[in-house]
Curated annotation (Swiss-Prot):
GO biological process, any: peptide biosynthetic process
Family listed: Belongs to the elongation factor P family.
Alphabetized Gene3D superfamilies for the sequence: 2.30.30.30, Nucleic acid-binding proteins
Gene: yeiP
Domain of life: Bacteria
GO molecular function: translation elongation factor activity
Protein name, as recorded: Elongation factor P-like protein
CC per GO annotation: cytosol
Provenance organism: Shigella flexneri
Sequence intervals crossing the membrane: none
């Protein structure tokens, strides 16, 4: 069984009789000597959908669950439901808007390549996105000529409604690459 410091976003733990899907992990390093590093993890309870927060020491042993991952394509929206189609056997997977609210901030219209659904024992758990996505800037303050030497940032609204910090020299209409997990600008898209 792995230790708490080996847990990554998207893994599922069997903890206190609950199946918990890791959504976010904060690492808190201690200032006192001999104190253990704490891992504050935010989970989504697979069965109830409720948000759960737990703290672990780095060397705590946790019980993980092996998931089935299937590559999918975005198919269509039906009211409040988003339907994804399995790339191999064309099985439809349906999520409500609430279940994938975070993921929708990074998903361009028409979907994106390398999306996966996570299932366990025939139960649909989560939608997993690739590490990066290319999105277009739709709104930001105008670019400042000669600002490429400065390291200042400004907020930019992207085509999906997501707001992130970008360098000052970028302007609306440009496509940029975003690191999804860290919600950070990586560079201009090819």
């Amino acid at each position: 069984m792995p230790r708490a410091n080996e847990i990554k976003k998207g893994m599922v733990l069997n903890y206190n009789g609950k199946l918990l899907l890791a959504k976010d992990i904060d690492i808190q390093s201690p200032t006192a000597r001999g104190a253990a590093t704490l891992y504050k993890m935010r989970f989504s309870d697979v069965r109830t959908g409720l948000k759960v927060e737990e703290r672990f020491k780095g060397d705590d042993i946790v019980d993980t669950v092996t998931l089935t991952r299937r590559y999918v394509d975005f198919s269509y929206v039906d009211g409040n439901e988003y339907v994804f189609m399995d790339k191999e056997d064309y099985t439809p997977y349906t999520f409500t808007k609430d279940q994938i609210e975070e993921e929708l901030l990074f998903m361009p219209e028409g979907g994106m390549p390398d999306m996966q659904v996570l299932t366990w024992d025939g139960q649909l758990l989560a939608l997993e996105l690739p590490q990066t996505v290319d999105l277009e800037i739709v709104e930001t303050a105008p670019g400042i000529k000669g600002a490429s030497a400065s390291a200042r940032n400004k907020p930019a609204t992207l085509s999906t409604g997501l707001v992130i910090q970008v360098p000052e020299y970028l302007s609306p209409g440009e496509k940029i690459r975003i690191h999804i997990e860290e919600r950070r600008y990586m560079g201009r898209a090819d």
